[in-house]
A protein has these predicted regions:
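Active-site neighborhoods and metal-handling regions in enzymes and metal-associated proteins
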Residues: 1-264
Length: 264
């Protein structure tokens, strides 16, 4: 209720455009009077689920035979079929792009959340960098990162956070018994989660050990330069695809075999 109230205060006049509807769950929340016996508890004969609430809202608003927007990009097939069976006369329209746009525009408190998460992640990576040397195991690096993040008391390390070296550095894998050698590249792909605030970070970097092949140092420099170019080019209004190409095409000029799904 507090979060809803704060959100409405931020929205101001636009707050009337959304309504929060409660529904039943298996969690039996009771008032103090009910617990002490001062008030009578009336048990429901049946639970009203979120889908029950949805059906009621659609029918009360006379929408069961009209056009309904759904987020098809993330809706699972059984749930969508349930919608079709419940509202056979409705026309379902994919509005996934509208949700993407809504999520891409961050409020000030969300921006601050990401800044805090990134700072905590960076501190964790820094602590790991202090111990990266030949003889250190993958699991030791992972433990160092996790301990640093948990010590903040603000968030938790992502369960998929990985630190790998040698042959394992070329694939996505959980930390195992790999030991850093002076010719290795040490890779990390890790992040932190804000738990029930549902925000997360995802960062990947690599450390090149001192006796690694010279070409690996040149590749590392090119990747770093591409990243710096991308950061320098970032500005409001610039399409993300253009920002991506700034780094991607710079690296690909020198390394035609380069492939990357995202740069961040």
């Amino acid at each position: 209720e507090k979060r809803v109230r704060e959100q409405k205060e931020r929205l101001g006049e636009e707050a009337s455009e959304f309504v929060v509807r409660p529904y039943d769950t298996w969690v039996g929340v009771k008032t103090w009077d009910e617990i002490t016996g001062a008030a009578k508890t009336v048990d429901k004969q049946s639970m009203e689920s979120s889908f029950d609430m949805l059906k009621k809202m659609v029918r009360d608003m006379d929408l069961a035979h009209k056009k309904l927007g759904v987020e098809l990009a993330y809706l699972n097939v059984p749930y969508f079929r349930q919608l079709q069976e419940t509202f056979p006369e409705a026309e379902f329209v994919d509005i996934s792009s509208m949700f993407v746009l809504a999520r891409s525009v961050k409020a000030e408190d969300e921006i601050q959340m990401f800044r805090t998460l990134c700072r905590i992640a960076d501190e964790g990576f820094y602590q790991v960098s202090r111990m990266v040397r030949p003889g250190v195991r993958e699991r030791e690096m992972a433990d160092c990162f996790r301990q640093s993040v948990i010590a903040t008391g603000f968030c938790v390390p992502s369960s998929w956070s990985m630190f790998s070296t040698g042959p394992s550095g070329a694939r996505l894998t959980l930390p195992e018994d790999g030991i850093i050698e002076s010719t290795h590249v040490v890779k990390y792909d890790a992040g932190v989660n804000a738990e029930f605030d549902f925000y997360t970070t995802d960062t990947s970097r690599a450390w090149v050990m001192k006796d690694a092949a010279p070409e690996l140092f040149r590749l590392k420099d090119r990747l770093y330069e591409g990243q710096r170019r991308m950061i320098a080019a970032a500005r409001p209004g610039l399409p993300v695809c253009e920002l991506f190409r700034t780094a991607y095409e710079y690296v690909k000029e020198q390394y035609p075999c380069y492939r990357r799904g995202h740069c961040g």
